[in-house]
């Protein structure tokens, strides 16, 4: 039997007990989702793929600072439509923090909670090009840019510059909005192919809009 003696000059390589954990890369697409439509899903999926994110959270607002509260249907309907819209789609997940917190949904307050709760996660906050114009007016924006990386997506008729750090992602130009869907329904027109069929079925079943 051979015995190997270790001397003070013997180099011993030790396997690290704890390997550095890879940080999670998570996108967030907030919105009223009144109702959710196909452009929402395309934006979320394209940003996830193009930036190589682990997942994108679809985060419905409870009471947006910029939307008339009277025009927003109850949150349980908006949440159910989101659940129907993303069923079976990999990489898209619903985040209900703002519905649970209630009150006005300021992005700074939400991201402060999420970043403190998940210190191992890098967040990418997705906004339309039309919202980039308003970044200087966002609540506590200078602190918010230290918490998240903003991702701007191109929409029809909007192309802007900004002094804030924004990653731009090109997505298929689909000029669809929730207000367009609501207008179609108010006029008695079916918004076929503008939103997932299960969502449209739910709207008709519940008599929404």
UniProtKB/Swiss-Prot annotation:
Enzymatic reactions: nicotinate beta-D-ribonucleotide + ATP + H(+) = deamido-NAD(+) + diphosphate
MF-aspect GO terms: ATP binding; nicotinamide-nucleotide adenylyltransferase activity; nicotinate-nucleotide adenylyltransferase activity
Keyword field contains NAD: yes
Enzyme Commission designation: 2.7.7.18
Enzyme class, spelled out: transferase
InterPro entries: Cyt_trans-like, NadD/NMNAT, Rossmann-like_a/b/a_fold
Keyword vocabulary terms for this entry: ATP-binding, NAD, Nucleotide-binding, Nucleotidyltransferase, Pyridine nucleotide biosynthesis, Transferase
Keyword NAD included in the entry's annotation: yes
Function according to Swiss-Prot or TrEMBL: Catalyzes the reversible adenylation of nicotinate mononucleotide (NaMN) to nicotinic acid adenine dinucleotide (NaAD).
Full protein name: Probable nicotinate-nucleotide adenylyltransferase
Source lineage: Bacteria, Bacillati, Bacillota, Bacilli, Lactobacillales
């Amino acid at each position: 039997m051979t015995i190997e003696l270790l001397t003070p000059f013997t180099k011993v390589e030790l396997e690290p007990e704890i390997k550095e954990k890879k940080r999670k890369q998570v996108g967030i697409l907030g919105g009223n989702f009144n109702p959710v439509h196909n452009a929402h899903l395309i934006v979320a999926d394209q940003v996830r793929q193009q930036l190589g994110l682990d997942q994108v959270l679809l985060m419905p607002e409870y009471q947006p600072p910029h939307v008339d509260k009277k025009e927003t249907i109850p949150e349980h309907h908006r949440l159910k439509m989101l659940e129907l819209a993303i069923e079976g789609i990999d990489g898209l997940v619903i985040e209900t923090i703002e519905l649970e917190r209630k009150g006005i949904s300021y992005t700074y307050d939400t991201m402060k909670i999420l970043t403190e709760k998940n210190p191992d996660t890098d967040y990418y906050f997705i906004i339309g090009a039309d919202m980039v114009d308003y970044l200087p007016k966002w609540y506590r924006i200078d602190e918010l840019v230290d918490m998240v990386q903003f991702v701007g997506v191109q929409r029809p008729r909007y192309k802007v510059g900004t002094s804030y750090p924004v990653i731009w992602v090109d997505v298929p130009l689909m000029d669809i909005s929730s207000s367009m869907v609501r207008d179609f329904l108010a006029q008695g027109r079916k918004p076929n192919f503008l939103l997932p069929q299960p969502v449209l079925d739910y709207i008709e079943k519940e008599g929404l809009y």
